[in-house]
């Protein structure tokens, strides 16, 4: 068997509306995902046992034990196929860890697709998406990519028409935020509030249909931003820098701490990136475009 390499994008929540906590501990969500051109590569190789190795961004923060989502994905797929999960997974990370960009979910999606090919299963994409939902809320979208509406825990996906491409700048933090901590802080901040059923705004869907960056920038929204900034007040300074240098929109990505800025074009994205780098409010900066395709097999 030859090695199989899969490239998987990061995700950005253009809008994230969080409902009340459910009995199972999750929250009902309404979100619009967009896949962006920050990628992890997952390579599956033949092996006698199931093992994983990691290189690149934030290696020391990535678990190498059974909690690694790529290993979880391998076991879910092997159980579905009725085989022993024998393979080595090598992950090359460029998506920051614990950054609100679903890097772990991307690795799980990459493992699913790479092992599907390595083990010669060639399951329908719909079956892989169903398996992905067993692993984590963001894993199905990492497979699908582009732009999509997510309901339930975020795993129930419907494609969204998005014309054109959008230019993004991401400001990363040296210290991550744990997603459960951010949700717990949101619950604390909203304690006693009556929450409506979550739904995305008509304004966001309209901005995507027409492909206008200025319209999209004005309707970016994230219910978790309040909680993330409460836990990390320094994020407010990062968001302010982007606003001051003309970003069309500024938002905490998912549960944070990464901040995302929408630019008018590539030139303005460079200006915003330079300003953020000079400000000292973040550890590093990257530019990306979206939407892009989901997990796909590439030449190693």
Regions found by a protein language model. Give the residues of each.
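Conserved, helical-rich catalytic subdomain that frames metal- and/or nucleotide-binding sites
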Residues: 144, 151-249, 264-270, 274-277, ...
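Short, conserved aromatic-histidine micro-motifs
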Residues: 60, 126-144, 272-290
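Glycine/serine-rich anion-binding loops at beta->alpha junctions
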Residues: 63, 90-119, 137, 247-263
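ATP-binding N-lobe of GHMP and related small-molecule kinases
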Residues: 1-99, 117, 121-126, 163, ...
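Residue-level signal for inorganic ion chemistry
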Residues: 14, 42-44, 70, 104, ...
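Contiguous, small/hydrophobic- and glycine-enriched helical/loop subdomains that border
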Residues: 86, 108, 112-149, 153-156
């Amino acid at each position: 068997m030859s090695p199989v390499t899969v490239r998987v994008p990061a995700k950005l929540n253009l809008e994230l509306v969080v409902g009340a906590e459910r009995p199972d501990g999750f929250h009902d969500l309404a979100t619009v995902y967009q896949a962006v051109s920050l990628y992890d590569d997952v390579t599956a190789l033949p092996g006698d046992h199931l093992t994983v190795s990691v290189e690149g961004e934030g290696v020391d923060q990535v678990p190498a034990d059974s909690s690694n989502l790529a290993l979880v994905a391998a076991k879910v797929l092997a159980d579905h196929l009725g085989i022993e999960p024998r393979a080595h997974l090598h992950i090359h990370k460029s998506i920051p860890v614990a950054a609100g960009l679903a890097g772990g979910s991307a690795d799980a999606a990459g493992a699913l697709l790479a092992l599907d090919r390595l083990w010669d299963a060639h399951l329908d994409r719909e079956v892989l998406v169903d398996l992905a939902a067993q692993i984590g809320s963001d894993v199905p979208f990492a497979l699908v990519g582009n732009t999509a509406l997510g309901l339930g825990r975020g795993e129930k996906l419907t494609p969204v028409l998005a014309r054109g491409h959008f230019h993004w700048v991401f400001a990363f933090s040296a210290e991550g935020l744990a997603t459960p901590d951010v949700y717990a802080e949101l619950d604390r901040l909203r304690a006693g509030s009556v929450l409506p059923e979550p739904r995305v705004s008509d304004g966001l869907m309209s901005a995507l249909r027409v492909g206008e960056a200025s319209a999209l920038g004005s309707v970016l929204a994230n219910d978790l931003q309040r909680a993330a900034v409460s836990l990390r007040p320094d994020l407010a300074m990062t968001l302010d820098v982007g606003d001051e240098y003309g970003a069309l929109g500024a938002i905490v990505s998912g549960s944070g701490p990464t901040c995302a800025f929408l630019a008018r074009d590539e030139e303005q994205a460079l200006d915003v990136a330079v300003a953020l780098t000079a400000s000292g409010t973040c550890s590093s900066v990257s530019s990306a475009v979206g939407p892009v395709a989901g997990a796909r097999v590439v030449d190693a």
